[in-house]
Amino acid sequence: MTIARREFLKATSAAAGATALSRALGEHLEASQRPEDVRITDARYRPLADYPIQPLPFSEVRLTDTFWKPKVDVNAAVTIPLEVRKFVDGERGFGGNILEAAILSLKTHPNPTLQAQVDAQIRSTAQSAGRGNSGFEVAATLFNVTGRRELLDRAIAAADALYEEFTKTNPPFSGGERDAINCVQLYRMTHDKKHLDLAKHYLDIRGLENSVNRSRHNQSYKPVLEQREAVGHAVNCASLMVSLTDVGVLTGLKPYLTAAQAMWTDAVTRKMYITGGIGTTGNEGFGKAYALPNLSAYAETCAVLMFATLNHRLFLATGDGKYIDVMERGIYNNALSGVSAGGDRFFYVNRLASAGDGRDLRWERASLECCPPNLVRFLAAMPGLVYAQGPAGAVYVNLYVSSESTYAIGAAGRLSLAVQSEMPWGGKSTITVSAAPGVKSSIKLRIPGWARNQAVPGGLYSYAVKVATEATVAVNGTRMSAAPDAFGYVSLDRVWKNGDVIEVDFPVTPRRVVADARVKDAGNRVSVERGPIVYCAEWPDVDTGKALELLVDPDSPLEAASDPKLFGGVTTIRTRARAIGHPSAPPGRVTLVPYYLWANRGAGEMSVWLRTREYAPGDVGPAGGLIFYVNPDYATDKWRYLEAAPFDQSAGAKWGCFRRQIAGARGTAVGTGQQNTRDMLAACPDPGTAAALCASLNVNGVGGWFLPSRDELTLLYRNLTATRVADFGEAGRADNFSYWASSQLTADMAAHVDFADLGRQHFDDKDFPRRVRAIRAF
């Protein structure tokens, strides 16, 4: 029997009961062990107790800060009920991530109305027929958090049936990375080896020669243990890395963990945005190495959340703080950008620049099962990322968040910590021992990479200038060494006493960040960050409203200032900048705001990466195309640059107006293409012609494109194809490697430039199909 992925990935309707899988599940349910016979672990919430280092459960961390606690509270009071209401109103019921988020949130934020909705949904799920998956992860969470097992027995039976089916028939299958994670979750409670074996099986059958749908997009192009690149769908790739890590840790088979770490390294050192986001392409996937466009960035909210899960797991497996560095960057920036300040609007994608055309406003979409449900689940459990405990009882302080927590030390000892932290707006944190175990124990303080002059591990991004200020650590007023170990931690080992005080101070001065030179979209640009927070320029804080056209003074001071009126009080950064293309204009003051807060004040331009010099031919332009001309007469013409679109508009379009002499469209010089295009459209507005294709173009929210004149097109060839020929047509092919210009010769003929013939200018019939590449002036 071939088992379709959806039959067990997703809870299905009663109609699924007719499938062979559902019949198998039904038979197994009848023959399965009774609940009291199934061996289950203690219901105390210890979701990753099988890792070398274990997180302190979210419900055992009491947040007291003014940054994360309000967000977790809004999530509980506004966002989760909103998501539940969407699905209930749609008569679909709610399950999966939303149900899991609600279960988690109710543990720390009781809500009678939400509790009643959760109870009703659990009853409905438990009683429904033909549910192939039965929600392994939800069942695990429900039992772990509450001890309730209404969904657990069905999940166990489903897993057992799947195990039997796969081991009997071993059908060709592309593999299920999330199914592997879910099976591991189930195994953590049952300790039934076949559930772990099923998780491993999902990985082992992936990418085999007889696997169906083998491709790089679904990470099945080769066996998983041979994969070393982060490729394909970003969420699924991160999920695959999580499942590899889980299986590697639980089985002790190092190749699984090695594969996950190699893929992580590829993502972080070549394919990650400065905001911690991953995924650059419209198919929700990883792009080529160092191809990190800003206006068309994907950086899906779901992807950064799964990547945060991966980074947390890799830390728990290895103790290496570099994984927390990357996790911290992602959750403070990309993840929080995914939800509005009010908790009721969402981003699916998180671009690093916006043209302000309105497409980058957060939305409230009904019944979307992807990003919002994942985000509410993340926020509900976020406190579980703050601390961890090693096998010898060492306490890891990973995130500096005002909070209270308690740890078991030895047979009966307890260590309680009360943290007061200024983070992320200030660098000072005070950790007070409020209960001591009476025996020697270790507290490990993470020294973030950004406090050690390291923007990200691997050097994809680095600070333009290193600062001499270092982190400081003191215990009871006595200065201690703040030099971290190889994993980024300072270990304080002693017999702690009640009232002992640890003081930590990190430099949180604003810093300019530059990207690896191979990241073309960040060339001659800087981003600005302070501590873990990445900043951006947004339209309300720019005099002209043109955040995409800012040129910042690279020598201007970066001044941090608290703004109590902005979203309840955040730290902004002030610097000096001027409009690009106006070198004689004096720089003015501009205020940068935290990236995660952008698009909360209406539609308008935004940019994370800010220019530090004027454009030159070959630079990536504001619309993501290529600059190919700098106009020396900008004061007269009112434009400074010509930018070529980043892709062809057609591989074979007609010029139009064949055998028709139109008024105008005769300009050949630089600066005449835009008027030529207007003349062409006025005379022959037929869709699909070269001029119409250019005029209707919108690239990443940027319009104003036109068909270049003959001399403009010749300049484009001369200034770009020497180094960027692959960006035009099919490099190396001589057939139809010629582009239309907007310059008319006669009623029958118009100019074109042959890119396969050294850029020679020719004239040909307007009715002949040729390539089209739009340009724009700004």
Please report, for each region that a protein language model flagged, where it lies by residue.
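C-terminal, surface-exposed recognition/capping segments
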Residues: Y615, P632, P687-T689, G703-G704, ...
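Asp-box/WD-like beta-propeller blade repeats and closely related beta-sheet repeat scaffolds
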Residues: L152-N170
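Extracellular adhesion/carbohydrate-recognition regions
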Residues: Y615-V699, F737, M749-H752, K766-I775
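Aromatic (Trp/Tyr) and acidic
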Residues: D37-P112, G132-T146, R154, G176-K194, ...
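C-terminal beta-rich recognition modules with glycine/proline-rich loops and embedded aromatic residues
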Residues: E36-V38, V72, A199, A260, ...
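N-terminal export signals
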Residues: E7-H28
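Secretory targeting signals
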Residues: M1-I3
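Helix-terminus loop motifs that line ligand-binding clefts
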Residues: I98, P112-S134, G207, K271-T280
